């Protein structure tokens, strides 16, 4: 992963050359601590700060993709990680946004306990499901999937939890399933 981040670092730092004042801070919007976005952003900023440039990089925890896009538009962060589908949609309304590189392919997955009776989307009816944190890409994906499957909110009780909270609540039996938009190798 460090090799990929080093290459990305070169690209981003080249793109930012001349965009920052001496001694300034570049704020990197990640997501929740413990996730892949945060891990990537943390490694990226550590490598960037080791280079001795006239600026420093700092990670900002956020709710995820949607939040990062909003925070970029609000000038709260200078770099952010977001899902490709959300970036494409955001670009339609804000042409000042730029994508630097794709990091990895993400899929939206539905996570249940091994002993769960939930086998299909239809089985979610009458259950409690986390659809992701409020400004996350997962929330958007989960909402789209449930709408496409014809599952109105009257049939499924939803909660807005990040992956860490959702995992704890699933183990405790407080929710029955949760959506997770992440790389295939992500551990939850």
Pin down the residues of each PLM region:
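Sec-dependent signal peptide recognition
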Residues: 2-10
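C-terminal motif of bacterial Sec signal peptides marking the signal peptidase cleavage site
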Residues: 15-18
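Bilobed "Venus flytrap"/periplasmic-binding protein-like clamshell domains
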Residues: 23-51, 55, 106-172
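Short helices/loops that flank or line small-molecule/ion binding pockets
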Residues: 42, 65-77, 164-178, 183
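Structural recognition of the beta-strand scaffold that forms the well-ordered cores
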Residues: 58-59, 78-83, 109-111, 130-132, ...
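A ligand-binding cleft/hinge motif common to bilobed small-molecule-binding domains
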Residues: 73, 81-93, 143, 147-149, ...
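A structural signal for short loop-to-beta-strand junctions that line the ligand-binding cleft
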Residues: 95-103
């Amino acid at each position: 992963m460090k090799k990929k981040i080093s290459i990305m670092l070169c690209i981003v730092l080249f793109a930012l050359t001349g965009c920052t004042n001496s001694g300034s801070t570049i704020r990197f919007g990640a997501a929740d601590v413990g996730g892949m976005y945060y891990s990537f952003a943390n490694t990226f900023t550590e490598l960037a700060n080791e280079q001795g440039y006239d600026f420093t990089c700092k990670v900002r925890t956020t709710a995820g993709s949607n939040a990062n896009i909003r925070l970029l538009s609000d000038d709260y962060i200078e770099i952010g990680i977001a899902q490709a589908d959300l970036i494409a949609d955001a670009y339609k309304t804000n042409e000042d946004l730029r994508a630097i590189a794709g990091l990895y392919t993400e899929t939206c997955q539905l996570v249940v306990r091994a002993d769960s009776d939930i086998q299909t989307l239809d089985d979610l009816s009458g259950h409690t499901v986390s659809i992701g944190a409020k400004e996350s890409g997962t929330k958007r994906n989960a909402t789209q999937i449930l709408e496409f499957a014809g599952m109105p909110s009257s049939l499924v009780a939803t909660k807005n939890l990040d992956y860490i909270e959702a995992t704890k609540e699933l183990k405790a039996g407080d929710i029955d399933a949760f959506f997770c938009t992440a790389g295939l190798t992500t551990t939850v």
